[in-house]
Amino acid sequence: MALDPERRRQLHAMKLKSLVRDYLDDSIEEVVGTDDGALATLSGARFAALAEERCERAMGGALASALRSAADEVHVFASDSTDVLARRAELFSTSVKVWEVNGGVATSADSPKPVTEKPAPDVPELVSTLQDSGLEVVTEHGVIVGEVVGLEVARIICDAQGDRIEVGVGAHDREAFALLHGNMPTVEAIEQVANVVRFHRTPAAEPHPLNRLGAERWLRSHLLAQPARIGASELKAAPPPVQRTNLKEAVPAVAAGHLDDGVDVVVVCAVGIDLDLIPFAADARLFLDPQATLMVVIPQRDAHSVLYDLANQLIDPPLVVPIDDAWREWTTS
């Protein structure tokens, strides 16, 4: 039986209290349990956070809460993704220490390892099929997909059964489509699914799951087609620093290219307020091109002051670029 949410938050708070007592020797002024962990304001201008769920996304929330508490030293305890957290911690001017928790024992997290991208399979004929079908071909961490306005409608699969294109929006949809339309020619199948997605991913479309999924990738697709909107001369889709695990999770979308003056740029797009956007964006630049200018592109309504506060905590701050809230209505004309 799943724990009651309130009981889960209480247990998270108790665990953080225990870790602080055992490893930091600070008095706790306030502790709050959350769905994903816990946050604690400590004596001596210090702050502690516990990451129990979605650990790789814990850095932004910890730093934002530390800023509100005027803390100048942050400790993050996590049981998973401590390499990601430690790597991102080094990109901030704030003093951040990451602890790896195993069986109630905390140790200093290992030095962050550089991210390496898995090579994509060499399947030029299948890639050409996606391109000839009018899809945007995107490769991330060895996975090749075909997208329509930023939403995946086809994926190249290479396994023991051979190399092939599976059609559908996400893994479950691909399986269902194969069961119902397994004998349909690939090009025809792509066209059928792509047309449905195009119909729903237009400004005038009624609310629908197909126009709510992957909004950040929809925004990126606009910028790839119209880089001048943010002062760039060329942009191409680029992989995130951590591979996406599913289509439903909102993960900032990344692009790389050149500004009008020729300067290399890494662009990170997001829709909605995301406290972990700045750590993610800084990690994306580190992964793709540490010397590039970093631009964080968000709708104006999502340009919350905490985003700027976190951006200013980076050793090499990004350009935060708010764009029109009606970006879905942009056209290429």
Language model features: what each stretch is:
Residues 1-333:
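Charged, terminal alpha-helix-loop-beta segments
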